[in-house]
Amino acid sequence: MATSVLLACGLNEQKLPGFVHISEESNVDASFLISCVLGQRLRISNAGTLLVCLQHHYQHYFNAGMRLGYNTNIFQGKTLGVIDVLSDMAGEGLASKWLTNTEGQTLTDQLVEDIRAQVERNYASRNSYTVLIDNLSILFNLGASKLQVQQFCQDLAALGKEREKLTVITKLSNSDIYQLTDNNVAKLGQVRIQVLRLKSGVFREVDGKLLIERVLDEGNYACEETRKEVLYKVNDRNVKVFAPGEIGVKV
């Protein structure tokens, strides 16, 4: 299952921090974290979740969920909402609203508008609400500028600040390439999880390293940052974590 990795990342609580950013290094796949968080949120009674599919379509998350022991179809349309950008574009082609400039709105403007509409429709009736954005990098591929992506994330962070029980979780792949954007987005939140390659290269028992950074508020003028490193291995039906050095791997 996914309990150990969520516990290591501090994402196993019913109430999550307002903004969490996942930085995915090149040649590393951090999609498992989105699937793990999704499953955890769906299991909480009356917790709402909105999944925004940019990198993978909804069916991918359904399949991943079944391997991790949960069925997204049971929750869809109830506590789970989905904005499946990828499937919309595949089904509608160039007619998709995500590929057209509607009334002068950019892609990111339209996406924020749809997310806000879903939140306003469902937030009040839920004990908590989580918005999952599976890969900001895809917005660059669809023509969004770095400034538009940054503004998109700022709008999402503002949405979270307006609502005490709302959490926004974003992921950015190739974070070492989009380093400036990645750092700017990470500064919007309280938790940053970096998914990194092993310095020693490929190892059969470990897929990579998680560096978890958390900012703890201490009044108006001071804060404390905690850092933790763990190794992880994604198996077919679970994700395991290890302490560095536990299995003799140099990181």
UniProtKB/Swiss-Prot annotation:
Q: Which GO terms describe its cellular component?
A: cytosol; elongator holoenzyme complex; microtubule; nucleus; spindle
Is this entry keyworded Nucleus?
A: yes
Q: Which CDD domains match?
A: Elp6
The phenotype of cells or organisms lacking this gene is: Larval lethal with developmental delay; larvae spend twice as long in third instar stage and die before pupating. Larvae display abnormal tissue morphology with reduced size brain, ring gland, salivary glands and imaginal discs. Larval neuroblasts have abnormally shaped nuclei. Formation of melanotic masses in the hemolymph of third instar larvae, increasing in size and number over time.
The record's GO molecular-function terms, alphabetically, read: insulin receptor binding
Which regions form coiled coils? none
InterPro entries the record matches:
ELP6, P-loop_NTPase
Keywords in alphabetical order? Cytoplasm, Cytoskeleton, Microtubule, Nucleus
Q: State where the protein is found.
A: Cytoplasm; Nucleus; Cytoplasm, Cytoskeleton, Spindle
Gene Ontology biological-process annotations = establishment of mitotic spindle asymmetry; melanotic encapsulation of foreign target; oocyte microtubule cytoskeleton polarization; positive regulation of insulin receptor signaling pathway; tRNA wobble uridine modification
Secretion signal: which residues?
none
Pathway listed for it? tRNA modification; 5-methoxycarbonylmethyl-2-thiouridine-tRNA biosynthesis
The record's section on Pfam families has:
ELP6
* Principal location: cytoplasm
Q: How does it assemble?
A: Component of the elongator complex composed of Elp1, Elp2, Elp3, Elp4, Elp5 and Elp6. The elongator complex associates with and stabilizes microtubules; efficient interaction requires the full complex. Interacts with InR/Insulin-like receptor; the interaction may stabilize Elp6.
Main function: Component of the elongator complex, which is required for multiple tRNA modifications, including mcm5U (5-methoxycarbonylmethyl uridine), mcm5s2U (5-methoxycarbonylmethyl-2-thiouridine), and ncm5U (5-carbamoylmethyl uridine). The elongator complex catalyzes formation of carboxymethyluridine in the wobble base at position 34 in tRNAs. Binding by the elongator complex stabilizes microtubules and promotes their growth.
Instruction: Give the family from UniProt.
Output: Belongs to the ELP6 family.
* Misc. remarks from the entry: Named 'poly' for the abnormal shape of larval neuroblast nuclei that resemble the nuclei of mammalian polymorphonuclear leukocytes.
What name goes with this protein?
Elongator complex protein 6
